[in-house]
Amino acid sequence: MTERVTYRAKTKFLVASPTKVRPVANVVKCKPYVRAMALLGHLPHKGARLISKVMKSAASNAIDRDKRLDEERLFVRDIQIDEGPRLKRLWCRGRGRGDVQLKRMCHITVVVEESVRTKDGSKG
């Protein structure tokens, strides 16, 4: 059994909370690339825009490496949203006090592969 070739793209240090981006990633995980991009285009979240950029990069990497591929044959195999570093900012409060506000960052990794169809039309 031959192993399928995967293509990936990774973006680091995006200023977005991983807990807010993960639900968007779960919507498009394990879907065909074209359908996933259409879904992301209709979502109003900031995370949808960020994931869309990384998915375009992964598809571009795949097409650059293998010229016979096109976007209709790509499949989103995995999306990982990892936690990045946190920026600590001072938030001034009343009576001379201050609170620490954490600006969270995330790393997004998208893995795409070629979708293989069997003779009966189902995915294999």
Swiss-Prot record:
<dbReference type="InterPro" id="IPR036394">
    <property type="entry name" value="Ribosomal_uL22_sf"/>
</dbReference>
<keyword id="KW-0687">Ribonucleoprotein</keyword>
<dbReference type="Pfam" id="PF00237">
    <property type="entry name" value="Ribosomal_L22"/>
</dbReference>
<keyword id="KW-0694">RNA-binding</keyword>
<comment type="function">
    <text>This protein binds specifically to 23S rRNA; its binding is stimulated by other ribosomal proteins, e.g. L4, L17, and L20. It is important during the early stages of 50S assembly. It makes multiple contacts with different domains of the 23S rRNA in the assembled 50S subunit and ribosome.</text>
</comment>
<dbReference type="InterPro" id="IPR018260">
    <property type="entry name" value="Ribosomal_uL22_CS"/>
</dbReference>
<comment type="subunit">
    <text>Part of the 50S ribosomal subunit.</text>
</comment>
<dbReference type="GO" id="GO:0006412">
    <property type="term" value="P:translation"/>
</dbReference>
<dbReference type="GO" id="GO:0019843">
    <property type="term" value="F:rRNA binding"/>
</dbReference>
<dbReference type="GO" id="GO:0022625">
    <property type="term" value="C:cytosolic large ribosomal subunit"/>
</dbReference>
<protein>
    <recommendedName>
        <fullName>Large ribosomal subunit protein uL22</fullName>
    </recommendedName>
</protein>
<dbReference type="InterPro" id="IPR005727">
    <property type="entry name" value="Ribosomal_uL22_bac/chlpt-type"/>
</dbReference>
<comment type="function">
    <text>The globular domain of the protein is located near the polypeptide exit tunnel on the outside of the subunit, while an extended beta-hairpin is found that lines the wall of the exit tunnel in the center of the 70S ribosome.</text>
</comment>
<dbReference type="InterPro" id="IPR001063">
    <property type="entry name" value="Ribosomal_uL22"/>
</dbReference>
<dbReference type="InterPro" id="IPR047867">
    <property type="entry name" value="Ribosomal_uL22_bac/org-type"/>
</dbReference>
<comment type="similarity">
    <text>Belongs to the universal ribosomal protein uL22 family.</text>
</comment>
<keyword id="KW-0689">Ribosomal protein</keyword>
<keyword id="KW-0699">rRNA-binding</keyword>
<dbReference type="GO" id="GO:0003735">
    <property type="term" value="F:structural constituent of ribosome"/>
</dbReference>
